[in-house]
Amino acid sequence: IPASLPDDIYEQILELLQPACTRVVVDATGDLLLKVLKYKPFLIKPNHEELGEFFGRGPLLNEEDILAAALKLQQQGARNVLVSRGADGAVLLDENGRQHMMASPQGKLVNSVGAGDSMVAGFLAGYLKTQDYEEALRLGVAAGSASAFNDWLATREDIDEIILQGVTNK
């Protein structure tokens, strides 16, 4: 958050949006994330390092630890917890308690800047189109990977190519 904004700006925004029943996505860490969980965001997306830091640990490297931490975040209010794991893919604990794991496609890391945001965008596009968490995760992993494999953010063609190569469940 820029220094010119109050520390509770996310809370102020979510308080205003709450009556509209808006689905909110939060990609924040630490206290910012903790303070907005009470608003029951539709999706939060920490990476495995941020998730470990949130609980006072190092990076969470295995699925069991990630899922246990994701469950704690759900118990605090998050509806869906999407955890990006870089080359190890992603883990999603959905609001129905189902666990989804996707492997990352093969490719050469060129630039990881924006890959997490691309994953969120792909996930949301997939979910809004299909209402299916598995397909949303597949598109999210494809979009995040396609961005990581490019100098710039991925194009639709880049993402489609990754999907054709296959983004698979773990």
Where are these regions (language model features)?
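Conserved beta-alpha-beta core of the PfkB/ribokinase-like small-molecule kinase fold
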Residues: I1-E64
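Conserved phosphate-binding/catalytic region of the ribokinase-like
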Residues: L16-P19, L34-K35, E63-K170
